[in-house]
């Protein structure tokens, strides 16, 4: 299986660089897995597609202002993108600089805060904050929202709200779980009132989600690792939902990966809680254990995420759906439109 099999040409003007005026004002392309049928909808139409008794699983991670700007004592400027908070003082980060910082290099941040480079781990740098404040407090003071590279503009004040789900709770992500950006409080309340069950997992999306696949053979790709948590209440709700013959609907590929990671860890045993790092890589041929349907945005060409949805609804079906979306001028990527996918028979 070749990475090039998941390529497509996207006109630059279809990349959404700003969100819609209202969260739920996006368009929605539905793809029925069993038949391959497509339908053009509005995101608000999703309400009619979710049945009482269905379980919707959301990722409640909170995006941290993970981009920092600073300079070394020599005056050399650098940009830091947090990959993961190790504790209250230490981070793993990507560092962009004309020269990579060496161990013990001091970095002066905006706002008079200082960090020290204490170790290097392959492409990532371990940095320690030299302050009485915590990393999270400093990020909230001087950090910038880590907009994806393809948005290609500086972050603005509005991004602090719009590049964040309304139900965010646990800080740690450096990219938004973007399928969730379409939901507002009113829609969530309406779904609950309809009898739809709502549950939350956590997966702290890392910057690796934007890293290109650098091999030709899909099977040779090594996934980045991210921290995920699937608590007991979610496990119980999934069991109840399945027993009643209803659907588990994941909102976003991060929710999919969280649930399927829990299932993978259990092997042939019943689903149980999961908390820890996951590097699950889902590509065509994978058999889904938990998820019956999903809400997702449109993904980058040759990305692991387009491979995931192709595993869910079929390679040819996804290719045709994306061709249709481009022809109909859907908006792509993080601030773009959404899809509702049901699983192809396995």
Curated annotation (Swiss-Prot):
Keywords of the record: Cytoplasm, Queuosine biosynthesis, S-adenosyl-L-methionine, Transferase
The organism's place on the tree of life at top rank: Bacteria
Subcellular location: Cytoplasm
Record carries keyword Ligase: no
Main location: cytoplasm
Listed EC numbers: 2.4.99.17
Pathway assigned in UniProt: tRNA modification; tRNA-queuosine biosynthesis
Annotated GO CC locations: cytoplasm
A Pfam family annotated for this UniProt entry: Queuosine_synth
Keyword Repressor: no
GO MF entries: S-adenosylmethionine:tRNA ribosyltransferase-isomerase activity
GO terms for biological process, alphabetical: queuosine biosynthetic process; tRNA wobble guanine modification
Catalytic activity from the UniProt record: 7-aminomethyl-7-carbaguanosine(34) in tRNA + S-adenosyl-L-methionine = epoxyqueuosine(34) in tRNA + adenine + L-methionine + 2 H(+)
Subunit structure: Monomer.
Described function: Transfers and isomerizes the ribose moiety from AdoMet to the 7-aminomethyl group of 7-deazaguanine (preQ1-tRNA) to give epoxyqueuosine (oQ-tRNA).
Family: Belongs to the QueA family.
Protein name: S-adenosylmethionine:tRNA ribosyltransferase-isomerase
Organism, as annotated: Shewanella denitrificans (strain OS217 / ATCC BAA-1090 / DSM 15013)
Gene from which this protein is expressed: queA
